[in-house]
Every structure is written in structure tokens, then in C-alpha cells.
Amino acid sequence: MAYRKRGVKRENLPQQHERLQEKEIENNTDVTMENKNNNRKQQLSDKVLSQKEEIITDVQDDIKIADEVKKSSKEESKQLLEILKTKEDHQKEVQYEILQKTIPTFEPKESILKKLEDIRPEQAKKQMKLFRIFEPRQLPIYRTNGEKELRNRWYWKLKKDTLPDGDYDVREYFLNLYDQILIEMPDYLLLKDMAVENKNSRDAGKVVDSETANICDAIFQDEETEGVIRRFIADMRQQVQADRNIVNYPSILHPIDHAFNEYFLNHQLVEPLNNEIIFNYIPERIRNDVNYILNMDMNLPSTARYIRPNLLQDRLNLHDNFESLWDTITTSNYILARSVVPDLKEKELVSTEAQIQKMSQDLQLEALTIQSETQFLAGINSQAANDCFKTLIAAMLSQRTMSLDFVTTNYMSLISGMWLLTVIPNDMFLRESLVACELAIINTIVYPAFGMQRMHYRNGDPQTPFQIAEQQIQNFQVANWLHFINNNRFRQVVIDGVLNQTLNDNIRNGQVINQLMEALMQLSRQQFPTMPVDYKRSIQRGILLLSNRLGQLVDLTRLVSYNYETLMACITMNMQHVQTLTTEKLQLTSVTSLCMLIGNTTVIPSPQTLFHYYNVNVNFHSNYNERINDAVAIITAANRLNLYQKKMKSIVEDFLKRLQIFDVPRVPDDQMYRLRDRLRLLPVERRRLDIFNLILMNMEQIERASDKIAQGVIIAYRDMQLERDEMYGFVNIARNLDGYQQINLEELMRTGDYGQITNMLLNNQPVALVGALPFVTDSSVISLIAKLDATVFAQIVKLRKVDTLKPILYKINSDSNDFYLVANYDWIPTSTTKVYKQVPQPFDFRASMHMLTSNLTFTVYSDLLSFVSADTVEPINAIAFDNMRIMNEL
């Protein structure tokens, strides 16, 4: 922007046209210029006072320079020519500024907000059945000669038999089983919800769940069931102790399943709920805030229960060296915070039209086309003011870093920026953006006022421009204001166990605005000795516009502080402050809009909004801690199960997926492994540790109930005779390994040293390879005879590949369709392999009948705040922490 020389008066006022007449400029030229100027003023005045917000433009013809002016040699005409030449460039800056502000700076990401709000406490699910791994099944009994008897026998088998072969894979199966139990582990059990009628009961009794009822039916109908057991089933019913609110239900469970369910019943997370707990659940600062009137609607019954949320703090310190993860968390918090910050609607703001008209009068914009003050009105609208208000509060609540966008030639933006830097702590801004804004304020306003040379700032200087200026400026008020900004930091205060970032008391009560105004008044009184008069006047008028709204700025500062602190009371995770990877853009023109349009109407969050914000924060925080506990338990279990090939990164990925808000594939690997290392350092939560120990103690029992795998194989060069087995008939099964040399199959495969086996086999010594192997059955006698002469292990020893071993279970019994082929009882079937298979646990009704105890009834409430009715005082009467109205300017 080109400026006139000192002492040169404005040329487009009527008095100046008279002078041009006196100085022998032709009358026609004067009339033409005067008409053009009048028309231009009229058009621009209409546009400024119009309710429509539109870009101010000039008629293109006006930019063409008149031939008469070109030919004129007068000094005034030359200066006018210079101004008109630069006006087009200046207009582009104005249009850019307006365009920047009319484009919305924030697009709400509904998907992230929905993910956050959809995180619900899992305890809301009702448990409709007991946890079971086993179920009883009937298996036939075989005679000594291999014929099947008519009798049956009951054994415990796996409900879902998916056991893989291979010791390592079996251990991985148990890890997956553990993970499944952690997901399904109920926070509470109410047996009354799942109880069903016992069809065989003589007095309409109930048993604990449908599976128990089905087992009872099957046993009752089994011909071999003893009469005493039938009579017992007929007597099975619940036992109620109403005075103690307790009920006992009969159940039929495998001892391991009973141990799990008994543990779940004895370690429920529900706690008694009463009015006092609900009232204490409300954040203390909301309870004690006189602007909110809270009341309990009803008393709770003695059977009311709730699950205390898990709100442990900073177990992983995601703010420390996890840039991508922290950026995602703060972004989610920012989107959530924006949704709860109250809106400054048009009725709460000063009328944009009236305010722009008043500003035009203050600026005396009769010479609108050639004054730099034109930009002061650019982009002022209520939408921008509301956007700025929400951005400032939401960014502080989520500790999101902001970056500033501004045009240096718009002095009004920079003066508004001085208010912004006064009120918002420096840490909230990207350092480079903060330095650029401070440097623009110093070199545009502060240093020119005192006639000081421009500041040449070295990139990378540890000091900010304001810190350098504070040491160089002699004026007390300005230096004092700079000192305040340079030391404006959040104060970290722990309130209710949560680290809060609180504002300086001078900001909270608005007194800092007086300090800002003193500095601005001092600057406006300076002479700007090295700058043109117009420059000084533009700065002074910008300061005048802001200083005219001193009362409103104090109120605005108090309003921002109050809304920030009230919403901050609903945050449950520590507010750690770290500069974020991405930033939220803030236009300084929107700050101008906020400063100029803020009215005297108080807006505070509604109680329902506060409760919603609090509930979402609690649910996310609690889910975050529960998922940490799951991940820590799985990592510990993987180590204790010696899963040396397990990719820990997959456990960390599952952990992040269950937190809902992360785009896991985009998280850098270094942060994944760092997260793994931090998870490894955490202790396992007690309930999860106990459950894992239960699995660890019973792995063998679970494994032997599977029909998919055997526990080893005995191999020999000499044929071994098939033996009778009660469950399978004549088969090559061994039920124990007594007398055999044992070698661990997994170790053998890892080392690859088969010499020991080869030597033993060559010496005609059978050897037992112990490990989980496929339990393959083949009852076709034809295929059996085809394989009898084959030496099963010879090929394996030759190839040295033990993992290809598929031991075969040979069945020769009366079930075979080809049984007539082996009617010659002199023939003795043999095999060079014997499958080692442990005997599953027989089903014993008496040992499997357990009485389970739980409360007869209780009601679990997940939304505690639904019992609280809340209202606010009239917003105009709302008071801040200092017991004065938030908005004093009426």
C-alpha cells in the first residue's frame, strides 16, 4: 500500500476540489471528478449499510486513469495518480481478507463425534447364560472283542472344539480363549434373569439356565440313569431367602466352568447406589456453581446398583512421544468440545448492520475508497464471531494447538490479535504462528509508534518478538503489557484428582483488559515519527474502535473464561499440554468480529449439555482404562504361555481398534512398539490375572476334552499290537506313556536334531513324541489293511520333517461296514504307531451339580445423572467466580 507524504491533505474532499479550481484545472474536469467521487461514495455507503454481506468492489472504469490527470503536472494530481495506481492491489487484499472469512474454517466431523458418543458402558448388557467351555455328551461303550454295547457313557467334551494341532498353536488357542473370556466377562450376574423352568420338576421349580435344563432333560430320559438321580432332578428348584435378597439356583457345570462362574459371581463390580453417590458423581464445581440449580427427582430403592467407572489417570502418557495418537485424541476431544460450547446466536450479538454503521461513523469513512481503514470492516459477521468463540474455548478444552491467519495490512486484525494474545496463553499457539503474529504487531504498531527501527527477527531465536521488545521499550504501560503476555501460561491445578489447565486470575476477572487498554492508549498517543500522518491516523482509529468497546471486551473475556472453566469441570482425563501435529486455524478477522459484535447477553452451557459432555468423557475414559487392562493382560499371558512367535504389534493394534477413534493402519510403527513397551510395564488387573491363572491350571483338562488332537505318538520299527479301548474298540491308542522314552515334539522341531530318535529306532526301542498332534480317525477296514504294511515313520526319519507326521487312529470294531472282512479272529491287527490320547473326564452327575448364589433382584443404572433435574438462573444474573455478574456492561 502506498501512502501519501506527510502534510499532504486528502484530495477527494470538496475543499480540495475548490483548490484545484483555483489552481487553473478546467471546470469540466472538476465536475467529472466530483460526480465520480459522489457516485462512488453513494454506492459504497449503500453497500456498507446494506444488510447483505458482500465484497466491496469498485467500478472497473474508475481504475482507468483519466487522460487529463495523466497530462496534469500539478503535485496533487501526481499524488492522486499514485494512489489510484495502487488501489487495485489494495482492493485485492481486501477481497482476499473477506473471502478468507466467508469460507467456514471448521467442518464438523460427525463420524468422530458419533464414535465418541456411541461408547457406552458394557455393563448395560444383561447376561442371559452362564459361561461354559464344556458340555456332556453320550459316547458308546465297546466290549473286549470290539463289539459295541447297547449301553452309553457320558463324558465332558468341548462345546466348541476348535483346538489346532501343534503345541505352539494350542497355546495360542488358549490365549485366544483368554481374550474371548475377557471380552465376555460380565461386570455383574443376576441369575434370576437367566433362570428357566425345570420341566421335570414336581413343583414348578427353576434351574439356573437353559443349558442346565437341557442336560437335565437328556439325563432324565436316559434309560441307564439311576432312579435316585431322576428323583433328585424332580426335586431341583431355586431356594429364595427374601429377607437377605438372595436366591440359590441349581446348575450342572463342569468343575472348571463352575470355577469361572463362581469367580464371576463373587467378584461383581456392582456397588450399592443412593442419592448421595449420585450427587457426589456430579463434578464438584458444577454442584457448587450458583448458576446451576440441581435437584434430585426421587429416592432410590435399596436394590439400586451402579458400576463405578474406571478413571485411572495417565497410565500410558500418550501425550509423551506419541504424536500421532495424541493428535487423534485431541482432535476427537476438540470436535466433542465444539459440540457443547454454547453458540453465540445473532440475537446474542450486536446487529452486524448497526455495528458496521457505527464503526463507519467512528472512522469518518467519507473517503472510503482511498483509506486503509476500508479493511477494518472486512469480514465482520456474526458467523465469524461465533466460530471464533467456539474455536477458542474448544481448543483450550482439548489442548489443541491453534495457528493464526492474518493479513499484515489490516491493522484492525492486528489490534484484535493483541486482545487475543492477552487473553489466551501463549502455549495454545503454534510457535511459528505466534512469532509471525507478534512480529507483525511489533513492526506495524508498537515500534513505529515510538519511532524505533523495524525488528529483524532471527528464525530459531529462543526469545519471541514480544520478549525482545519488552527489554527495548521504555514506556512502562506497554512494557508491562508485554511482560504479562510473555508470562501468560496455564496454571496446572489438580482438582478432584484431574489435572486442569487454569487461566490467570487477571484474565478470569477481565482486569487484564484494562492493562491492554492502557498500553493501547499509550500507543495511540505516540507520534509515529517515521511514518506518514495517514498511517498514524489509521492505527489510532483502529485502537479507538477497540477502546470504545472496553466494557464489552472485559465482559467477553469473563464470558470465555467462565464457559471454559465450567466445561473444564466435566473433563475426567488429565489435561496434558503438548503442541499437536495438526492445528486449528483461527482467522484474526474472526477475532475482530467477536470483539466488535459481542453484546451484553450472557450465554452459559445448559445443564443437559454439561451432563452429556461429562457422560461422554466418563465413558471414553473408562473404556480406555478397561481396554488398557485387557491389552496388558493379553501381553502378560502371551509371555507366560511362551508364545515366542506372537506379534505383539497385533495386540497393540487390537487395543487401539477397541478405543474406536483411531485409524489404526495410519499409526506409525515406532509409536506402536513404544506403546507395546509401555503396556508391558503395567501390572495386570486382579480379576484378569485370576482368570488367566484358572486357564493356566486347567489347560490339560481342556485339551483332553477335545476330539481334534492327541497328546503325542509312540513310534517303533516293530509292529505293536492294537489294544481294546472302551471308547473306541480295537485301536492303536495308548492311554499312558509309562515305560517309553519321551521327547518333546516342539523342541525337536525347533532344534532339528533327529539323531536321537533315529538311534533309538535302530535299536528297536519305541520312542514317545509328546506334543499336540492331529487325532485322525479312519474306521474303514479296507483303507486300514492298505496301510498295515507301511512303516509310518520311516519316511519321516528319512526326510527329517517331524511336522509332517499324521498319526492314524485305526478303528476295528463292529461299527465298520466292512467288518465281515476281518471275521478271521486268528488275525491280530498291528501298527507301527500308537496315538497317545488322554482320557476325557467322565460326567458324574453328583460332582457336576452346583448351587449358585446371587442377589434375588437389583437394578443397574448406567446413566446416574438422569435422576438429577437441573436448571439455570436467568443468564443475565449468572455470576463468575468473583461473585460479580459475568456480563456487567448493560
UniProtKB/Swiss-Prot annotation:
Residues 28-42 have a biased composition (Polar residues). Residues 9-26 have a biased composition (Basic and acidic residues). Its main location: virion. GO terms for cellular component: T=2 icosahedral viral capsid; viral inner capsid; viral nucleocapsid. Keywords: Capsid protein, Inner capsid protein, Repeat, RNA-binding, T=2 icosahedral capsid protein, Ubl conjugation, Virion. Coiled coil: none annotated. The keyword Disulfide bond does not apply. Residues 404-424, 432-452 are annotated as: Hydrophobic. Belongs to the rotavirus VP2 family. This is Inner capsid protein VP2.
